[in-house]
Every structure is written in structure tokens, then in C-alpha cells.
Amino acid sequence: TNDKVKMLIKSKKISPGDIVWADYQYKGRGQYKNTWNSSKGKNLLISVYREFKGLSFKQRNYINFVISLSVIKTIEQYVSNDNFIKWPNDILSGQKKISGILIENNIKGKELRNSIIGIGINVNQTRFRNIPNATSIKLISNNEIEIEQVLKKLIKNIDEHINILIVKDFDQIMNLYNSKLYGRDFCRFLINNEIFQ
């Protein structure tokens, strides 16, 4: 869906806030060129086009933070597991991956021009071939969920969190983000080739 948004930007057929929504994906992209397939009609697969006027190149990570918070808040409206953000782009529910995020930023000079925000949430899929450690809202809740309903909640949560970003309340964003960060309760150290926690 991110590639489709890029095509629409090039042809000037997209506006800030527009969404590209796919029913299924067979060439989903993640970090480090990882790919995956999604069952038809089972998951929420979108890309959102947004402009962030006034944000600098150095502040681009805050987009990742607010999107991660938006996704996790949406998932928490359906499942009560321990839900965490696994830096940089995964959302975990009960130690299993339930969502992935891929954000591609367009930078000009030191200014952030726009972002393509790709989000995949496992909603009703129950079998994940060749993907160990994956889960979905349905697997956790035992309920079939209307995907359009998940989309509406997600967009509402994105708008709320982006409003915090627009007013540059970076402290609030970081406090919220750190409260949901996976592994925040321990640190690992390497001393003389030995790992300590």
C-alpha cells in the first residue's frame, strides 16, 4: 500500500489524510526488506498519507512514536493482553506480534515534507504460515471483528495522537511511548563478552 501511495503522490492524485486500504497483501514490506503475505479480507492493511509542516528531520522519530501509540490504543480496545511497542515498528500482544508499522518519510533539506504511514493489524487471521510468534485480535478475543470498525477507531486514534505532535508536546509523547515500550523494565549489558540483565 505504501508503493501505491507513492504512485498517487507522483501523479498528484492524493491529498494529506487520504488512505489506501488493501483487502490482502502478497508483497508486504517490513524492516530490513522482510516480506509477508496476508490472508484475503482478514486483516487491516492501510497506508496513510500525511504532511507534517514545521517538523524537522531530527523530529521524524516522533511520527513513529505517535503512530505506534495509536495502533496500540486501537488494539487495546479489543484485547486486554499485555500490549507493548517493540522498537522500531512492531506491536506485541501477549509476547506475539499483532501489528507492524512501516513509515517512509520524505525529507527536503532539514524539513520533513510528508510521510507515508503503512500499518498492518492482524484482525481475523488465525493461521500464519511461515510466521512464528504471530497472533491476531480474533485469536486472542475469540471474536470475529469488523475490519472497517477497526479502521475507524485507528484513524480516530491517529488523529488524536497527531494533534499532540502538532502542538509539539514531545514530553507527553515520550511519557506515553515509554510506558508502552517492550523491555523497558530491564537493561542488558555486555561486560567481558558476558551478557548481564
Predicted regions, residues:
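N-terminal lobe of the biotin/lipoate ligase/transferase fold
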Residues: 1-78, 144
